[in-house]
């Protein structure tokens, strides 16, 4: 029985709502880009967006490798046995899962470790219509990369300061940190080319689970690592969606990006 963080992320449903909202936009201004920005120059808007999407894919793959390691670990097996032994029967287990998956409050509680942003992924179409504008998309990406750039530096410093702890996964975190830093620079360049702005965006709270990563309790530390991986999955999934839409608007046209075909392909 796999752990829950190996299952599809609930943020996918939220992103579908964003797509639905995009289909409702009737008048969307294109990004202020020149017609010469569609060549193979890596510093053009096309080159930056293509490179950013490659980085996003690489980060996703590395994070999936972390989750694979967590899933097959001894601690994962111990937690599964502990949970199953606490259930009096399979019926009670099934009932628990139904209740858990059906309670938005419980799902929200499990995400309290994740970064908080002033502009968040909408929870419904009505909220989406009132929250997101095209100009916000590069800022939404930038804020997430800034948050993770800081978080991963702190996470790596903790591991390096405690030899023998998480040595097997530290190289993966360092690789992710490098690619996050690259994606952060790409995001700044995209924002600069699109709107002439390059400043940092103070739009996030620090990840609140660092203390648990320092815990002497192995179970607490393991669960904190799982939550860190899940939060990264949510934000990279969100950033990748925004990159795809920005690329479509910048290199194709607004009408095509907002067509029903684009929505279905997403």
UniProtKB/Swiss-Prot annotation:
Glycans are attached at residues 36, 58, 110, 149, 157. Keywords: Disulfide bond, Glycoprotein, Hormone, Secreted, Signal. Residues 1-30 form the signal peptide. It is found in: Secreted. Coiled coil: none annotated. Belongs to the somatotropin/prolactin family. This is Prolactin-7A1. It comes from Mus musculus. The gene is Prl7a1.
């Amino acid at each position: 029985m796999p752990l829950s963080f190996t299952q599809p992320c609930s943020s996918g449903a939220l992103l579908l709502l964003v797509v639905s909202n995009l289909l409702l936009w009737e008048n969307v201004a294109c990004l202020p880009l020149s017609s010469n920005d569609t060549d193979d120059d890596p510093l053009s808007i096309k080159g930056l967006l293509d490179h950013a999407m490659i980085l996003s894919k690489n980060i996703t793959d590395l994070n999936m490798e972390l989750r694979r390691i967590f899933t097959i670990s001894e601690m994962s097996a111990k937690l599964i046995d502990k949970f199953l032994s606490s259930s009096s029967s399979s019926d009670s287990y099934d009932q628990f899962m139904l209740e858990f998956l059906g309670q938005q409050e419980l799902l929200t509680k499990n995400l309290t470790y994740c970064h908080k942003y002033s502009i968040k992924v909408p929870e419904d179409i009505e909220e989406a219509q009132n929250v997101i504008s095209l100009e916000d998309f590069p800022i939404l990406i930038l804020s997430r990369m800034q948050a993770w750039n800081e978080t991963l530096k702190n996470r790596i410093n903790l591991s390096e300061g405690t030899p023998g702890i998480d040595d097997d996964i530290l190289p993966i975190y360092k690789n992710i940190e490098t690619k996050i830093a690259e994606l952060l620079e790409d995001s700044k360049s995209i924002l600069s080319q699109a709107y002439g702005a390059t400043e940092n965006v103070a739009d996030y709270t620090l990840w609140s689970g660092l203390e648990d990563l320092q815990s002497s309790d192995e179970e607490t530390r393991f669960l904190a690592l799982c939550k860190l991986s899940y939060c990264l999955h949510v934000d990279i999934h969100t950033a990748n969606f925004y990159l795809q839409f920005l690329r479509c608007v910048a290199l194709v046209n607004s009408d095509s990006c907002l067509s029903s075909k684009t929505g279905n392909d997403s």
